Amino acid sequence: MESVIKTYDLTKRYGRHTVVNSLTLTVPQGSVYGFLGPNGAGKSTSMKMLLGLVHQTGGEVELLGQTMNEENRIALLRQTGSLIESPSGYLHLTARENLEIVADLKGVNHRDIGRVLDVVRLASDANRTVGQYSLGMKQRLGIAMALLGSPKLLILDEPTNGLDPAGMQEMRSLIASMPETTGATVLISSHLLGEMEQMVTQVGILNEGQLIFEGPLH
């Protein structure tokens, strides 16, 4: 099976403090890969390095078969969708209008908007203003924005944080179905093992910046 993400000795230090220490991992194509670890383990920093949002102190990132560098970073990220912070959107606009803005920024045809709304189960609420949405609906809208343009890779940093139990369950179901419904490989972080068991096919456990286990979950 081909790999969508590979890292080699990926390291991030701030002064004398090592946040991520020689991280070497492999995310197989077509998987939902769970990045599991307690708060402060280095999950978010690792994801930001994968996206080039944080510059690594050492090591390499390989995305979609290419070692990422300044020359190819933008081209690789055009094939990658992400939700790293809380989803952003204009609260006074509808979900569809928000997606039209993102589609224009990405250079994506507006015909793709209907597809992503169906994937995240927001088609019936597409013409409501985002200010009327629950947190779970806003999270799903954020994923819809990330899915515009049919990325090969989707990176999600703790997307169930702050959701009520019903919202958490809906989000888990949505993420577990992503490879089948969108063709995307998914990298998702969480600090909850029980949550991972409901979503992922592969898991990497991170503790104090080090990968201590990687392999199939079941």
Model-based region annotation:
Residues 2-7, 12-207, 211-213:
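ABC transporter nucleotide-binding domains
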Residues 218:
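Short acidic-hydrophobic catalytic motif
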